[in-house]
Amino acid sequence: MNKITQLFKIKYPIIQAGMIWNSGYKLASAVSNAGGLGLIGAGSMYPEVLREHIQKCKKATDKPFGVNVPMLYPNIEEIMTIIVEEGVKIVFTSAGNPKTWTSFLKEKGITVVHVVSSSSFALKAQEAGVDAVVAEGFEAGGHNGREETTTL
């Protein structure tokens, strides 16, 4: 066991990225069933479609899984309400400041992880109270950071 496996209650310290268009319930549940942490990517989903994916994921696995939510999502209030209503226990946030939603999620018993592209963003995420950060360099798809992963 290590800190990652303990935090997420998973067998292996492997986390599948919450990629827009590619990370629905099928991939998330497969990764979770294999012992990692699967993530549903909410970024391209309408709120009710996300609800369906969460419900299908819960039927497909009894293992932990999470949802990745870009902070710039236009219907973020509805998305966060669905996450809470459906009992999701892990949320990864990205593409914006997690400060607005971190307290709300943590008050509901949800583990919050923020994806950052620089050390300064990591410090801001820490100040916001997230449980962990994922550092991604400019090599990662869909991210605007200027630093490589090796310098983070």
Which positions does each model-derived feature cover?
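Active-site entrance/lid segments in N-terminal catalytic domains of soluble metabolic enzymes
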Residues: 1-152
